[in-house]
Structure formats: structure tokens, C-alpha cells
Amino acid sequence: GSEMCIRDSIETVTLDVIPPVDGSIAACVTDEQKEANAKRLHEEDVIRNKYVGTFYTEEKAEALPKELGIDPLKTADFMIGSRGNWREIEKFLRDAPADKRPMAMDLLNVISAKDLRDTPASVLADHLNNAQAVQSSLFTEYILNPRVANEFLTPYRKFFAANVDSALVKKAKADPQLIVDWVKDNISINDSLNPQRIPIMPMGVWKSRVADKGSRDIFFVAVCRSIGIPARIEPVAGKVQYAKGLNWVDVDFEAAEQTVAKQGKVVASYQPIKALQDPKYY
């Protein structure tokens, strides 16, 4: 064992601390208990499999794209991937106006697998029906996409379209820095009010005008996307950015001016030698 001394102002006590011998603890289970547990596990499997049996299958997914005139392979992927949320995804596709069905498919394609499984049709419909169509290669991922970071998805797009001053929107499309300035002037930062850093919903930030830095960043991107400005939280360095043309501009809410993000290119080259086989990529 090892010795541990505890000292205080009165006395010193020496203890021998001996760890228990490593090993499993034998459990005494009767045959009746084993049988009851096996029965319970079987009942749980029956309940689970009955529920899973209601999910979409490839056969079931064939009818919907024929009815709506949408891509059958992608539709099958979405419906099967949505698991128990298939009713919401089906409702979203059925309710989408015919001229917006291609955009509806793009929206489902850009959200995560988890979002397919737990996002209500009403949230998806808000982002589809209130998205400002912009002719840009960045549109689907950085304007239409409702997902910014790890926030709870909410129907914020119609809200911001109605509440952000129209004069500001018009000017900001030409100069997105105006949205940066608005956020700096109107949103107070108080990280101590959200020690767990659970993202505040963008609409909540608008109403309270207070947020932690992470929620402020999500709010900024959500507002930009709602008014047709491509924006993101860059996934590698976590920088907040908006796009001006096809150039990404870093946002620093503490800086007076924003800087254009530097663009680079990584090239992997290989010179073969006889002593080694060529590398293979998986």
C-alpha cells in the first residue's frame, strides 16, 4: 500500500491506503430473474421493432417522387434517413409549392442527418418560403441553409424579414459591414449569464438584445442569411464571416475594420520510387 499523511494544526495522522484487488463482482441471479429479464428484453425489442416498422422503406419511397415530380433517389435517401421523423419530411415536401420543390430538395440535402431526423415541417417551411433567392453558388449552403452551428433549429427567417429595418436591409446587401455595426451597437455581450454556453435562439437574441459571444455569432449569421447575405461560422478556425462576391470577409466585432480572409491552396504531390509501392487512399 501507500502512505498518506493528513496534517492540520492539531495532529498528524498516517493512513495506509490499499486499493482493492482488481476483478469482477459476482452477481447472484436466480433462474426466475434471468427469465424475467429475458422476457422484458423481448418485450422491448417488440415495441422498438414495431415502431421502426412504420419507417419509410425503399419500396414505400417510390410513390412520393412520382407524385411530386422530384428526384427518386434523393427522396428515398431523405425519407429513409429521416427515420421516425418521416411524417414531417413528407409533409414538408407535399406542402412545398410546386415551383419551390427543387429548392426544398436542396434544403433537405444541405441540412445534417440529425436535422432530417428531428426538424418539424413548420421550421423547414419557414426557411424555404422566406428565403431570398440569390443567384450565387453560395446560396444553398450559406443562405438557404438554416443550420449555423450547434443551435436548436428555429423558424427565424420570416421573423427577421418582418423585423429588420427594410432600409438597413437594402443598404446591407451592398455593404454587409452595416450588419456587423448594427450588432456591435445593439447586442450587449454577457458571457456570465450563459455559463453552459447553450446557444440562445436567434429570435431570443433579437428580443433581449443580450447574448454570450457564441450566440451573438450565430445570431449574426442567421440575420445575414435571412436578408440574403451569405454568411457562416468557418468550420476550421471558427471565424465569423460574410461573403462579398465570392470572397469571405472575417468579422471581428471588436475591430474597427474587417479583413478579407486569405485564400490558400494545398497541393499533395508524390514522386514514385521503385523501393516502395505507390500509396493508396481510402
Predicted feature residues:
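Short, small-residue-biased leader/transition segments that mark boundaries at the very start
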Residues: G1-I6
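Extracellular beta-sheet/turn segments enriched in Thr/Pro/Gly and aliphatic residues
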Residues: R7-E35
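An almost-null, non-specific background feature
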Residues: D8, D22-S24, A133, E151-L153, ...
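Secondary-structure boundary elements
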Residues: E35, I47-S208, F253-A255
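Long amphipathic alpha-helices with heptad-repeat character
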Residues: R40-E44
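Hydrophobic/aromatic-rich core segments of domains that either
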Residues: D181, L193-K280
